Amino acid sequence: MIPDVSQALAWLEKHPQALKGIQRGLERETLRVNADGTLATTGHPEALGSALTHKWITTDFAEALLEFITPVDGDIEHMLTFMRDLHRYTARNMGDERMWPLSMPCYIAEGQDIELAQYGTSNTGRFKTLYREGLKNRYGALMQTISGVHYNFSLPMAFWQAKCGDISGADAKEKISAGYFRVIRNYYRFGWVIPYLFGASPAICSSFLQGKPTSLPFEKTECGMYYLPYATSLRLSDLGYTNKSQSNLGITFNDLYEYVAGLKQAIKTPSEEYAKIGIEKDGKRLQINSNVLQIENELYAPIRPKRVTRSGESPSDALLRGGIEYIEVRSLDINPFSPIGVDEQQVRFLDLFMVWCALADAPEMSSSELACTRVNWNRVILEGRKPGLTLGIGCETAQFPLLQVGKDLFRDLKRVAQTLDSINGGEAYQKVCDELVACFDNPDLTFSARILRSMIDTGIGGTGKAFAEAYRNLLREEPLEILREEDFVAEREASERRQQEMEAADTEPFAVWLEKHA
């Protein structure tokens, strides 16, 4: 079922230095909660400065939804330690609150008033909050409080030059972008391996169903928890953070200009469904506009092509200007077994898998084949650990045992691991392969199986509160390693100053400014 990459692997083994200098970064979301697990209703902690302009710590949908961001880093251990420092400082500066250690929220009812993230009075800040108002009115606030981890990855220029020859300028932009689209297509075809191994949301609290009927064959515990016995990541299911209205947009991942055109079209396409919400009610703006996407970031995707934007530039315009710079992987649940929601094993696996995706042949995909890949993902999401589970290739009818496909993939990954270990020293990547391949013969080793055992014993709430308490105590006691207290104080002050400067620089009323940006 997986493509034959033997020639590409042989090429890689002859050019190991092509992988020297992989860059990566992490983003981790987490809800601030009280000791009893309920959502914190306090504002963003003062010690963390301005959520609008802070370099490392911001907020996502809700005022209580923290987001930690590491700088781009070539060293895995350094990146994870930096992330841990962000958690350590925050844990010491959030009073009696804790960080929720699971992707799925629990003690939140749909009717509960979840405060949207606040970013001050600048037009940019008000625009960000209005975008979130639109998300709330379109999809409900509860869905937006689901948390995840994003892993950003880029291959070194040496890789592209070894693979594509001496490239520069427009030629480099085209060839590197084509290479990253190959990664994305392979990710859609085989990325289900990520929720299989690392999915950690096999259950939901009853409040999450909001009383709506569901066709999923949930089992229910006495404490009101709903779970699927073989599920891996309900966060990635239709119950979680997906957007059904986007499924017929026809956006594909074959060509930079085609992709950007599809994205720009979605921003201009009116939606009958969202038009019913209205734009304004009783003098209050309800959404930026009533198009299928308010802005480009609303496009739901398990992986995104990215380029760092310049001031005032949209993500798609940045891609048109310079091509794809890096890939954002968005299918990771919060790792409940790590105080920082992600660990070294996961990062090393993603390095291996991204390199494999860059090497493996990836025929172009139509929007219909893209939809067919969703079948495999859904199977793994809802019943990935089921004995005898099979997967297909695209829209073809042939089926293959997941267990065998996983082992075949890891046979390739082991060779990538040997190459990465040869240039980095040690056997860290090979060790990860040996640890994870065991999950195919023994699904009880997967994150979802391990966390479900705990949830069945103590419920989602009990499990979440116990982990949150343990991690709070641990992080508060650990000393900072890379950053210093004064670095956080300086960034707090600098971020507040940057926000004040933005607010002072605005000359147009928000309503006038919005007409130009809506």
From Swiss-Prot:
This is Glutamate--cysteine ligase. It comes from Escherichia coli O139:H28 (strain E24377A / ETEC). Keywords: ATP-binding, Glutathione biosynthesis, Ligase, Nucleotide-binding. Signal peptide: none annotated. GO terms for cellular component: cytosol. It is an enzyme of class 6 (ligase). It catalyses: L-cysteine + L-glutamate + ATP = gamma-L-glutamyl-L-cysteine + ADP + phosphate + H(+). GO terms for molecular function: ATP binding; glutamate-cysteine ligase activity; metal ion binding. The gene is gshA. SUPFAM superfamilies: Glutamine synthetase/guanido kinase (SSF55931). Pathway: Sulfur metabolism; glutathione biosynthesis; glutathione from L-cysteine and L-glutamate: step 1/2. GO terms for biological process: glutathione biosynthetic process. Its EC number is 6.3.2.2. HAMAP family: Glu_cys_ligase. Belongs to the glutamate--cysteine ligase type 1 family. Type 1 subfamily.
